[in-house]
Every structure is written in C-alpha cells, then in structure tokens.
Amino acid sequence: SRKTKSPEYQYLDLLSKILESGTTKSDRTGTGTKSIFGSQIRFDISKSIPLLTTKKVPFGIIIEELLWFCRGDTDTKILDKKGIKIWNGNSTREFLDNRGLEHYPEGVIGPQYGFLWRHFGAPYDTEFANTSTFDTKKIGGFDQLKYVEDLLERDPFSRRIIMTAWNPAQLNEQALPPCHMHIQFCVTEEFGVKHLSCMFMMRSSDNFLACCWNTVFYTILTYILAAKHNMKPKEIIYVAGDTHIYLRSEE
C-alpha cells in the first residue's frame, strides 16, 4: 500500500512531486531540469540494502567506486580498466580543457571526493591521482575517513562524526564539483547494541539516478564501518538541496 510510505514509494512520491510542482530551470549541461529545493528520504538498512526495483542500480560498480574513493584515487582510468566508465564523460580531454584544466592528463579529475576524504586541505598534484604508485604519506592533509573511524571507536556518541567533500578553495581544480558533499554518522544504543546511521547531503541531485545510486553507495559504506566497529547498521537518510529531473528523463 502506498500509505505505508516504504522507501520505494517515498522515492516515487518525490519523483511525482518534482514532475508536478517543480520549477523548470536551465542548467550547465544545457538540457534543462524540473527542480524543487529541499527533500529527504529515510531508508531502513537494518536488514537489507535499499536497492530500488523501479530503477536499475549496478551494485558491483557502486562498490568499485566506493573503494576508489576510500583509497583516495582520482584517476578514472583505474575504473575504466575494470570496464567501469561512469566517470569517463567528466574526464575527457575536451571536458578538462573546458574547465581550464589543460595541464591535467586525460582521466584525472582533481582534488575531489576520495582525495578530500583522505587528504583534505592538501595541495593537489596530478601525480597523486593513482595512489597505488607512491607512498600516500607524502600528500599530507587531514584524513577525514580515519577521523570518522577514530571517533566511532573512542567517542561513538559524538555529534561531530562528519566528513565533507566540499572545499571551496579547490573547486576550480576539480573536473566536476562534488554533488554528494556532506556525510554525518550517528550512533545510538539499544539493549546494549550500538547502531550506526548515516545521513548524506547532496547539493545537487539528479533524482532519476543519484538518489538510488548514492543511497546504495552510503549504505555499503555504513555496513563496512558498522562491521569494523562492532555495530549494527540502522538507517540511511538522503537529503538533497536542488532536487531535479532532467527534462530528457521526463518520459
């Protein structure tokens, strides 16, 4: 029943809301969108991963992208060699040149996501793009993923278990500024068992794709962290600013 507001129906309701009451806007791609501002969906992940059945979600590719982030990699050719081409369009020679990144080798996306998770605040160099080729200690910066894990271990009820992929000082060095850019974890305790929840915030969400994809992405990350720190996964909360559907996807 739609009245139960299962996660799947929350997702479909959000799509309907965008189509029915969204504002038509132009965008950087020239495609145009229907958009609303401010949305939220909550997913129970205590027993399963929320793979929405109304949209194909490539589970294996999402895992590879997550591991790529966790390593701090920013070379899309690492994924491409595995047949994963999700970043190829945003790292072509033409795309990089249009961003003013003529000095980047094709395939390099600059200081975003994984680099910011593992080396926030460090100066970026294209030699850092493939972390398997050198000792990453030379990069420096602040390791946010380690910070999160340290807090989960020694101060799990902290309200500061946060990572960010948004560094305004480096936006011009990025092939594409991060869309999902704020992640907060929360630990609760029930009957002596700790439960881990995650809220991720997207400044811009292509809701036909991003909601499904990134919900699974952060569910997997939460499962990994919960397992490492003797916790149970509880909830994923998706929050989006500009929540839109591209006009080409309306049908």
PLM regions: where:
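Terminal, non-catalytic protein-protein interaction segments that mediate quaternary/complex assembly
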Residues: 1-250
